[in-house]
């Protein structure tokens, strides 16, 4: 259910974002970002109905409590992640508007939108490839070997794609927006660095999801957004919006270290 919900949400968001970007520009991208959690929630309700209810011989519905209990950890993790992401994004947009100006907030949103656009496909690949492998009964001592195997397969492809995005950052910016947004090209190095570490972090993070490690998941999520907000507040006056994007990169480095530490602790190493 979690896997299907992620894939459906990713595909629907990508289509909606491309369409709204084409017709409405940056305003359309903002609408698409706001619609993403709504679409995710609706897809989840649909999948939950299919999983938790079964059709009887008389055409009615029979509630299956045991299957619903299995879904609750995934529902909680999805709602926590989606809720925190959008609350923090709104806060940071307001912070940039207050500390710098509205134009800078628009530039930061534009950079965020580009990142969200290509990361939609990365998330879909992870949901199809990584989550099923970790959902299998993998012994704890084989976890690191499995993670290494996944990274050896996916990371080179992701790295090449990100290098291509960086090399063509100016044409991409002009295609999606206009020459007025060309100044965001200076942010690409930090955003792509953040997303590269995010990919590695997600390999281990998806293990927490697959194994329903709720406490560890909550710890990592709260740490993630605390670092992002704290460093953004600290760096925004010195570096402007680049400081916020730098904070995002450091955030995922820290998350990677934390999640590996938690997993090694679980393995007794």
Task: Provide a role label for each language-model segment.
Residues 4, 33, 44-89, 137-145, ...:
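Interhelical loop/hinge segments that connect adjacent transmembrane helices in multipass membrane
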Residues 70-82, 86, 90, 94, ...:
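Residue-level signature of transmembrane alpha-helical cores of multipass secondary-active transporters
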